[in-house]
Swiss-Prot record:
It comes from Schizosaccharomyces pombe (strain 972 / ATCC 24843) (Fission yeast). The chain crosses the membrane at residues 19-39. InterPro entries: IMP2 (IPR037730), LexA/Signal_pep-like_sf (IPR036286), Pept_S26A_signal_pept_1 (IPR000223), Peptidase_S26 (IPR019533). Catalyzes the removal of transit peptides required for the targeting of proteins from the mitochondrial matrix, across the inner membrane, into the inter-membrane space. It is found in: Mitochondrion inner membrane. GO terms for cellular component: mitochondrial inner membrane peptidase complex; mitochondrion. This is Mitochondrial inner membrane protease subunit 2. Pfam families: Peptidase_S26. GO terms for biological process: protein processing involved in protein targeting to mitochondrion; signal peptide processing. Belongs to the peptidase S26 family. IMP2 subfamily.
Amino acid sequence: MANPFVRNQSFKSVFFKNLVGITLWVPVLMFVEQHVVSVGTIEGRSMKPAFNPETNMLQRDRVLLWKWNKDYKRGDVVILRSPENPEELLVKRVLGVEYDIMKTRPPKKLSLVPVPEGHVWVEGDEQFHSIDSNKFGPVSTGLITAKVIAILFPFSRAGRIDHEGFRKNAVFLSGKRSVK
């Protein structure tokens, strides 16, 4: 006797039903990847030792990128479009926020640079191998595409990003509105 609860469905109808179900999720997943969270690879050595501490550069850090929040604080590591070449993505640490006055570092002449509203001051952790705000000045927050929130790989270094490991003496004078 046949089981009345088992429907006799053809392979074709099951396939198309599953295909429609999967297809409905594609736009959702694309939105999440483009606007909320994604995985990226850190290239180069400008953020050593926080990222890519190995000298051979064969093993690059894989990181979790958060794209939703646009509130940047000192110590955040961000992905941004280069002000000099918008096709190029940079990884830098936010050292100054709007209304701060930043002291540039050598070899640039000692000078004080105010960070205007809607901008941040970014630098690489490895100061001798970094092209950053010391070269191109404060960066519009509109150029920032994501915040790095965790290292995923290598597993030996996996975990949340240290936001306290930045040059605390970078800020010469904090602006009133930026102090929290």
